[in-house]
């Protein structure tokens, strides 16, 4: 494969930025070939001895694996390796023993030939099997079962084995951030350059790396499940069953004590009230003599008669204690379920990125299809969103130096796609408040506009997936539905095979590639704002309402850009985009102009 002219322009320009020790983010349109371009940049940097090592990092295992496999097509590629952490690979020896056990037949009640066929398929292009790929290939949806396999059948690779000293290393953000964020002394050699694919996802991955949660409701449900299974086991000691029954009632009692009108329906920042409640839960659940005796008996029982729900429960136990002891804790209360949840959330994530991550990065190239949030090609907003401090930050004992001198203005490279390949239309109707009538309107518009073509419809959540499916009952045989617990990759593979109409959530706005006739119609029934009840947005809204709306809108614009980019993936593709959300018409004019600007980059108005 040879570089196209626009790809060569990127490689040459980015290599110069690395030589000058710059931070450089560029925007690449759909079908630019960003993975291939990143690999060729890494090759150039190593071949010309600009640096000794290049680390290519991306947002998830699937993308990292895809880049690794694409490197096989690059002629005379320097040595490269995939390193994505020690708990992502399937241990085939553990799997063989697992399949012969009682617990194995409970979790994977499948014919061995089916499992062997899956393993054979997954090793055609890739020597090590990713647990995520294995579970998706078997179409496993149950979250508890997935979690059990991930926890118990992982290949025990050390970091050095999975991330060897090769000139080019391909990894994911979680692995890279874990090394930097949890080992303050960790540094790569000075002659290392970084290429960050999907760079806009880096701060989101930092949040996932640093945060945890404990739900009293989840704990209660796990207990009830374990009680039922053990009670039905004739060999279970009666004393264990009695202790479990008492623990279930104990948990309900604790929850009643924890309830407080001051926190009902609210999100609280870390304060004395939260600390007292967390301490109370910790003491009442885990520090009572009965609780300690219960855990000891459960561990003993598990050694004799294991089952996966109990394995998950015991594995999580220490993590729960760690969460409840955290200083950065807040409480949320579910009025629907009647239980409180505790969450750690570090409001200083950007500060920690500046201190522990960016301060150790000498130069990098960031690649994204959604760098720009306005029509201004020279904005630096994406650098700030990624936690790069443009000015000095004064801490108690030191100063984190500002990185503005390293930051280079965003450059948007031209691609090979033309807006004339697609059309777009925007509803002129006001938002319909009544859910039933609104979804009837959506169904009418979809039936009128999809023309029998392969179609994706983006809705607001899984409840809306079901509601729209009901309204499209007349074509139910064509529908494929996103499901909670089922991976995006798994659903997309089914859609590729069968075609039809995929009703999906905002999670499907990025990371999928549906070329040609695989996708020709895209309906957006709800502007893809993030779920504001999640901890990040709930805390931000409580702390600074004005800044919340600024960030909240920016997040929607980024996801909207990603969503409309799903339709046209190659110069041969054609299609239509339908924006059906009536709330568009009540948006501020500046937000409307931003969305229309990005629509017109990929389509012309119908």
Describe these PLM feature segments.
Residues 62-65, 69, 148-292, 369-388, ...:
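Signature of the SF2 helicase/ATPase Hel1-core->accessory helical subdomain module
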């Amino acid at each position: 494969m040879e570089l196209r002219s626009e790809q060569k322009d990127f490689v040459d320009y980015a290599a110069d930025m690395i030589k000058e020790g710059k931070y450089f983010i560029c925007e690449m349109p759909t079908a630019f070939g960003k993975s291939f371009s990143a690999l060729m940049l890494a090759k150039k940097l190593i071949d010309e001895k600009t640096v000794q090592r290049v680390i290519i990092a991306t947002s998830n295992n699937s993308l990292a694996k895809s880049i690794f496999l694409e490197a096989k097509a690059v002629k005379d590629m320097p040595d490269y390796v995939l390193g994505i952490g020690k708990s992502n690979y399937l241990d085939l020896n553990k799997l063989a023993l697992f399949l012969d056990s009682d617990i194995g037949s409970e979790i994977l009640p499948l014919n061995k030939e089916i499992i062997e066929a899956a393993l054979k398929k997954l090793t055609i292009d890739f020597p090590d099997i990713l647990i995520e790929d294995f579970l998706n290939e078997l179409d496993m949806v149950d979250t508890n079962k997935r979690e059990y396999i991930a926890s118990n059948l992982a290949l025990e690779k050390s970091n050095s084995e999975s991330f060897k000293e090769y000139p080019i290393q391909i990894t994911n953000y979680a692995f890279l951030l874990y090394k930097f964020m949890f080992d303050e002394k960790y540094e790569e050699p000075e002659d290392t350059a970084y290429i960050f694919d999907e760079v806009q996802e880096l701060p989101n991955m930092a949040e996932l790396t640093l945060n945890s949660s404990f739900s009293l409701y989840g704990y209660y449900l796990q207990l009830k499940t374990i009680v039922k299974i053990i009670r039905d086991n004739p060999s279970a000691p009666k004393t264990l069953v009695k202790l479990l029954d008492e623990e279930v009632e104990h948990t309900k009692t604790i929850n009643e004590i924890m309830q407080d009108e001051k926190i009902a329906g609210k999100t609280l920042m870390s304060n004395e009230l939260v600390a007292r409640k967390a301490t109370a839960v910790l003491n009442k659940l885990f520090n009572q003599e009965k609780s300690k005796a219960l855990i000891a008996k459960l561990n003993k029982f598990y050694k004799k008669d294991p089952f996966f729900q109990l394995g998950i429960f015991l594995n999580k136990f220490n993590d729960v204690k760690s969460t409840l002891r955290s200083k950065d804790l807040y409480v949320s209360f579910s009025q629907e379920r009647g239980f409180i949840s505790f969450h750690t959330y570090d409001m200083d994530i950007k500060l920690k990125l500046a201190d522990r991550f960016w301060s150790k990065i000498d130069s990098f190239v960031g690649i994204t299809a959604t760098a720009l949030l306005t029509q201004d090609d020279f904005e630096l907003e994406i650098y700030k969103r990624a936690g790069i401090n443009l000015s000095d930050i004064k801490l108690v004992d030191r100063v984190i130096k500002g990185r503005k001198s390293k930051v280079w203005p965003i450059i948007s490279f031209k691609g090979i796609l033309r807006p004339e390949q697609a059309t777009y239309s925007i509803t002129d109707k006001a938002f319909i408040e009544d859910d039933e009538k609104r979804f009837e309107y959506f169904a009418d518009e979809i039936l009128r506009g999809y023309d029998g073509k392969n179609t994706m419809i983006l809705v607001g959540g899984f409840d809306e997936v079901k509601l729209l499916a009901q309204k499209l009952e007349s074509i139910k045989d064509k529908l494929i539905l996103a499901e909670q617990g089922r991976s995006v990759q798994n659903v997309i593979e089914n859609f590729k095979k069968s075609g039809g109409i995929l009703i999906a959530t905002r999670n499907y706005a990025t990371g999928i590639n549906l070329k040609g006739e695989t996708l020709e119609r895209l309906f957006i029934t709800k502007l893809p704002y993030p779920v504001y009840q999640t901890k990040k947005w709930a805390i931000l809204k409580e702390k600074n309402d004005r800044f919340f709306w600024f960030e909240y809108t920016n997040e929607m614009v980024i996801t909207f850009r990603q969503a409309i980019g799903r339709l046209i993936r190659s110069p041969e593709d054609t299609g239509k985009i339908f924006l059906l959300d009536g709330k568009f018409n009540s948006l501020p004019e500046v937000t409307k102009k931003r969305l229309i600007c990005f629509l017109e980059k990929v389509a012309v108005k119908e």
